[in-house]
């Protein structure tokens, strides 16, 4: 049966939370079976299950609402005319790329990611590759989503590990997007990636990044400093209800 609804996935924390709660309820059920308090324990299990279900339902509802607000803020900063070439870094299942493609006429969106359907999970970063492949944030899913949204003619998905190779020409994009992609780049490689981003962005082009403000060794202020030194006009926009997230905007001279 052909899917008619795009699948853009959920935060990994949401999925792991559901798994943990499911394991907990299963364990509680096992303890119930081997105990003599079947009726009372059964009621506890039912109550916990209902609590878990509505908690997850509420979480997903809030997640969808926040994701849409973030998208609208990114779009409002792009000031698209419809003819732009747009590059989406770490596109995942293609949510940002596909929504931007809907606003283009003769323009094109390129979504790039290192994960496709056939990416092996037994690599150098097992847990990272496992979570991406297992939860479906792959280029294969992105292509399917584009077909479902009828955007396949305005968007191209490219496989590339951007930490190693940026397969794009100099000054070839008007807008470059990312959504929580840069903070995943190892610190020793981040400057190389940022230099490549600058290389492929056209003069007067824009960078629009949704990122954490600070996370472990990550600090958005360092990204701002890098582009300030290149003469970019930069801004960091805070997000309501997401105190540690922001949208980073930079315009190339």
Locate predicted features:
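Conserved class I S-adenosyl-L-methionine
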Residues: 83-92
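Conserved SAM-binding loop of SAM-dependent methyltransferases across substrates and taxa
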Residues: 93-105
């Amino acid at each position: 049966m052909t899917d008619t609804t795009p699948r853009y996935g959920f935060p990994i924390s949401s999925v792991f939370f559901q798994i943990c709660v499911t394991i907990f309820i299963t364990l509680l059920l096992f303890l119930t079976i081997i105990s003599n308090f079947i009726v009372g324990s059964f009621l506890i299990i039912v109550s916990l299950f209902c609590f878990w279900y509505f908690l997850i339902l509420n979480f997903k509802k809030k997640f969808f609402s926040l994701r849409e607000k973030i998208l609208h803020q990114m779009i409002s900063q792009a000031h698209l005319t419809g003819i732009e070439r747009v590059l989406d870094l770490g596109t995942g299942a293609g949510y940002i790329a596909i929504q931007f493609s809907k606003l283009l006429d003769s323009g094109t969106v390129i979504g790039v990611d290192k994960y496709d359907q056939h990416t092996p999970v037994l690599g150098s970063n097992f847990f990272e590759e496992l979570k991406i492949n297992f939860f479906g944030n792959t280029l294969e899913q992105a292509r399917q989503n584009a077909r479902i949204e009828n955007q396949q003619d305005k968007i191209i998905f490219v496989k590339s590990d951007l930490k190693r190779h940026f397969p794009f020409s100099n000054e070839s994009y008007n807008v470059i997007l990312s959504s929580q992609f840069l903070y995943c780049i190892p610190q020793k490689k981040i400057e190389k990636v940022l230099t490549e981003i600058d290389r492929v962005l056209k003069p007067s082009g824009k960078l629009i990044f949704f990122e954490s403000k600070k996370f472990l060794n990550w600090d958005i202020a360092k990204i701002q400093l890098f582009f300030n030194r290149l003469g970019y006009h930069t801004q960091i926009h805070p997000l309501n209800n997401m105190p540690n997230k922001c949208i980073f905007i930079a315009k190339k001279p």
